[in-house]
Curated annotation (Swiss-Prot):
NCBIfam families: septum_zipA
Family: Belongs to the ZipA family.
Alphabetized UniProt keyword annotations: Cell cycle, Cell division, Cell inner membrane, Cell membrane, Membrane, Transmembrane, Transmembrane helix
UniProt-recorded name of the protein: Cell division protein ZipA
Gene name as annotated: zipA
Keyword Repeat: no
Record organism: Shewanella oneidensis (strain ATCC 700550 / JCM 31522 / CIP 106686 / LMG 19005 / NCIMB 14063 / MR-1)
């Protein structure tokens, strides 16, 4: 036991010494090298030992500048630094002559706004633009002497601009007038308006009296009833809208607008619904019915009604039956399709 303690003590001392040595070595390594340890110091030492002469000093001129234009550091007094000195002039660069700014005299006429100018030029631009450039260059030095001439010329141009603008407005009015009369012709509008009104009653009268009614029942399973709180959201999801005869109708438009395609009624008398009391309502089943002929494609309308009945039965766990309250099957489907074609 004592030998083990001795071994551990020796190992701990060795570890402490190693850590101290490593710390001193790291600190010494991070310190910057002195001038003696630098490589240039050794270079100068070797050069001195060989007896090589130091590089000759550079020659300086009378002003104290060497061949590279570098001179000795000079210390100036504060009074000297405050006195402004003229900038040095390079003799090799050409001195530009001082040009005094010339104030151009303003013309004694007012410029009209750009809105008074016409949209098109009265003269060809290829001939007018060079004359304007030469006229401006000639009149610039003698602007004061020709002020009256410029006033007359500007007045003539403004008058011509007003005349051109009036002509352009008259031409635009002549071009737009026939288009407006064609779009808003009272006689054509009065002739077409009664025709559109007369077409609607003809379409309604063409259906005539219903010759057949296609019926589908969605009934609850044996011993169960359909809850009104579940039926109402299903009706709204299937795009049915509460309306005439206190029942729900499926219209041409999903928003509840247009003609009625088919409807849903209560299977139990009196066959109506009360949307305000649907939570207290329960029934054995509901009836989908569609009259023939109907608006639009009868086959497409029946397909929508059949899919709606199946979707409702799946949502409320009910059963789809035909008009005789028999299970819906392929034979019944073919019979309904035959009745649709017969009344198309």
């Amino acid at each position: 036991m004592e030998d083990l303690q001795l071994v551990l003590f020796v190992l701990g001392a060795i570890a402490i010494v190693a850590v101290l040595v490593h710390g001193f070595w790291s600190i010494r390594r991070q310190q910057p090298k002195s001038l003696k340890d630098s490589p240039m110091g050794n270079f100068y030492k070797k050069q001195a030992e060989r007896g090589e002469a130091a590089p000759a000093p550079k020659r300086v001129d009378a002003e104290g500048f060497d061949s590279d234009g570098i001179g000795a550091v000079r210390v100036r007094k504060a009074s000297e630094s405050q006195t402004p000195e003229a900038p040095a002039v390079n003799p090799y660069l050409k001195q530009e002559a001082k040009v005094e700014p010339q104030i151009e005299p303003k013309p004694q006429f007012k410029q009209e706004p750009s809105m008074a100018q016409p949209d098109f030029s009265l003269q060809s631009p290829s001939v007018d633009e060079p004359h304007r450039g030469t006229k401006a260059s000639r009149q610039e030095p003698v602007l004061k002497s020709n002020t009256a001439h410029l006033n007359q010329e500007h007045a003539g141009q403004s008058h011509a601009a007003m005349v051109a603008q009036k002509v352009a407005e008259e031409q635009r009015a002549q071009v737009q007038k026939p288009t407006q009369t064609a779009l808003f012709d009272d006689e054509v509008y009065q002739e077409q308006q009664p025709q559109a009104v007369e077409e609607a009653p003809e379409t309604e009268e063409s259906l005539g009296e219903p010759r057949d009614v296609l019926v589908l029942h969605v009934v609850a399973k044996e011993g169960q009833q359909l809850n009104g709180a579940e039926l109402l959201p299903c009706f709204l999801t299937l795009n049915f809208k509460y309306g005439d005869m206190n029942i729900f109708h499926r219209h041409v438009d999903n928003a509840g607008n247009g003609k009625v395609l088919f409807s849903i009624a209560n299977m139990v008398k009196p066959g109506v619904f009360d949307p305000d009391n649907m939570e207290q309502f329960s029934t054995l089943g509901v009836v989908f019915f569609m009259t023939l002929p109907c608006y639009g494609d009868a086959l497409m309308n029946f397909s929508i009604m059949l899919n709606s009945a199946r979707q409702l039965a799946d949502d409320i766990d009910a059963v789809v039956l035909d008009g005789q309250r028999q299970p819906w099957g392929e034979f019944t489907k073919q019979d309904y399709l035959h009745r649709i074609r017969a009344n198309a």
